């Protein structure tokens, strides 16, 4: 069975929020190879300062950010009426955090480092 094709006529925009610059660069590279457009933010606060979340097909949020957590970011966006699907990712996993992420509302929860195909599949499900 072949791999799914993710390319669309107009690139799907994925917003990525992570405070690790190297990780952001890797994710942008992966997604661009598969036809996605990306917008990146190094903090939840930076994303909240604008209206970028309104233009995205999905949000890829790190849970453990320097200020507002990815989970709190999702809650704030949902509270302001955003219905943009969320994929949470974290390098520090525990059962409480996983449950909190699920309760906040997400289409996927990925443990870093994750297989690139898992991310692509999660985005296909979300977008």
Task: Name the predicted role of every residue range.
Residues 71-82:
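Short amphipathic alpha-helix used as the core "switch/output" element in two-component signaling
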Residues 42-43, 69-72:
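Acidic catalytic/metal-coordinating carboxylates
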Residues 40-58:
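Acidic, metal-coordinating helix/loop segments flanking the phosphotransfer/catalytic sites
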